[in-house]
Amino acid sequence: MAAGFLSALFPQVMLSEASPKAGSQCVFRGHSTGCLYLVDALAGDPEVLQADAETYYGELVKKSSSIPDVFSIPGGEEVKLEESCVYFVPLYRNNPTCKMLLLTDPKDKETVLAVYLNQCWWPVEDVVKTADPSRDGLISVQTFGERIVLFVLNYIIFGMLEGSSANDAFFLPHSATECAKIFWRNGEAVAFYSVKMKGSLCDGATSQCYLLPVLDTVFVRRKYRRSGLGMKMLDDFCQSFVAEDALGISCPISAAMYQVCQKFLQTYPEEQKRLWEVEAPGDWSQRVNIWLKIQMESSSSGRR
């Protein structure tokens, strides 16, 4: 495992203010007002945070008068807080006990509006923001708050809000120990990639382990695509494992990712022999050299 890949980069920051009223709406505006976003402020035991969410959900079901009735969507519209619009989903793959409470649009249950944490509702777009100016570029996922950001980017923003393209592959929630990096730009999480480490288990059903580091999932938010972020993440992945003779990218590779690979390998020809499209666990019978495949497909297209 590369030493720098999993280094601790930012400590968790405790909120100095008193806890908000259960079920309230959090709108944090950054350092200029002394406030922090969720990833900057979230600390404490995840089990306690989940217990808070379960308590809140129970009060919501009972229609307790102690919790707010509506959630204000950024832009002014209000959504009534009721049981039919709120549900739990697993935070991690293969771990149903750790759950996140989500609020959906009553007009479209596939649209998630907010996440419940720290005794308040956080609009989805606020969850992926930071007020910490040092949180910039690619940063390893370490804290529980960063795990939440990864979940929102992967499961909600990609899986529900921006995942309609036929070229995209559906991303399941990651495991609790998934090796991943989030790309931060201008105070916002705009992309991420995750890696299956060499020697890690392929899944919980077998004893097979990955035979090489594998770039497993890559996602860039739509408004930040075509700006070179895919190239930057692929380069960072390769630079994180300079001692490895072979690196994998999980099969199947999307058409958009193939374009990134082609441009990357043209720019860095020294990596052409190292990058392989692989199926787990990645032995030689499960590998196809990506550069060779690109050349063969280009040659085939030229003969048509």
Features from the language model and the residues they span:
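Conserved acetyl-CoA-binding loop-helix of GNAT-fold acetyltransferases
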Residues: 217-239
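Terminal substrate-recognition subdomain of acyl/acetyltransferases
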Residues: 1-212, 238-304
